[in-house]
Amino acid sequence: MAFLSRHGLALSLSDLEQFLAGAPGIRHNSVLVTIDDGHLSTWSIARPILKRHHIPAVAFVTPGMVGRKRGFDERISESYAGWSELRELTASGVQVASHSMSHRSLGAMSSSQVREEAAMSKTMLEDRLGVEVGAFAYPYGTRADFTTATGQILRDVGYRFAFTSQHGPISRGVNHWELPRIKIEGGEPLWMFRLATRGGLDQWKWIDRSLWRLQASPGR
């Protein structure tokens, strides 16, 4: 975060929206920090660091998991932030957005189920936190976890864009309902993070897409 702050690379969600709308003046290697799931560590660890370095960020939260000790993956022992922690998170400048209601994959759901997941999570976050929720991140976020129809439902419910977990940078003209991201693990060295901001990991998107095509091929 110190690196982003020092080089003026951090974007807000509003900045990204302006970029997607064609606004000039945004550096090509700018970064929007996103954090999925709403674990307690988003409040206890990430929030102070982001605040110290004046970094805007987006926390994608699953309302059905708020305050729980365990969630969708029993292998993860970390608790989830409660509503009071999420209010402190928004007060500190972190934007809270939707990660569905239950963290189930939307890819195999019916249209009515997708609509319910998207609408309920949006409404609950807005009502409990007093914020406007315009962004969504697909649970798991692989190509199997959303469809073109999913994006249309999100649009109808009132979202303006949605993030996947597919690897790649965001460019103008990209599908607003299939925004890629670049995953950075906590243990990765700073040089790799710097490389990512300079486009050095962009080529991995082709590997990501090729693997999906292999997995989706008949007989596999």
Could you tell me what each predicted segment is?
Residues 57, 96, 133:
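Hydrophobic anchor at the start of a short beta-strand
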Residues 3-92:
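Active-site beta->alpha N-cap acidic-glycine motif
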Residues 81-86, 90-116:
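Histidine/lysine/aspartate-rich catalytic loop segments that bind and position anionic ligands
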Residues 60-63, 100-101, 139:
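Active-site-proximal beta-strand/loop segments in catalytic clefts of secreted hydrolases
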